[in-house]
Amino acid sequence: MRHYEIVFIVHPDQSEQVPAMIERYRANIAARGGNVHRLEDWGRRQMAYPIQKVHKAHYVLMNIECDQETLEELEHGFKFNDAVLRHLTIKRDAAVTAASPMMKEEKARDLLQGAKADAPAEQPAAA
């Protein structure tokens, strides 16, 4: 079986359906003997350019291991699902399980915001 990296963009009005979509794709891959090595829900983000007059969308990244038939079925599902605005599939040499740069950046930003919130507010000196 081969390794693939898939990113798909979901219409923002359909964001509530993303967990169900992910679970459906996971079940489809597992039923055919494949494996999901990494799954990252990047959430709602600003797009570089509008697609169908939409400026924000919900992004999802999956690194999977599957056969060609399973991949074709996934891509067929993306193509005919109106909620999926775009998708990209890249063949990888090996399974990727480390966090993506996007998630590393988000974690660092969250840690910084958490540190600022935990820091005590400076008290003015009483004279």
From Swiss-Prot:
Which CDD domains does its entry note?
bS6 (cd00473)
Annotated region described as Disordered, given as residue ranges: 101-127
Q: Which domain of life is it from?
A: Bacteria
Write out the entry's keywords from A to Z.
Answer: Ribonucleoprotein, Ribosomal protein, RNA-binding, rRNA-binding
Q: Cellular component terms, GO, for this chain's entry?
A: cytosolic small ribosomal subunit
Q: Where is the composition biased (Low complexity)?
A: 115-127
Q: Which GO terms describe its biological process?
A: translation
Q: What does this protein do?
A: Binds together with bS18 to 16S ribosomal RNA.
Family membership: Belongs to the bacterial ribosomal protein bS6 family.
HAMAP family in the cross-refs:
Ribosomal_bS6
Please report the name of this protein according to its UniProt entry.
Answer: Small ribosomal subunit protein bS6
As recorded in Swiss-Prot or TrEMBL, the protein's gene is named rpsF
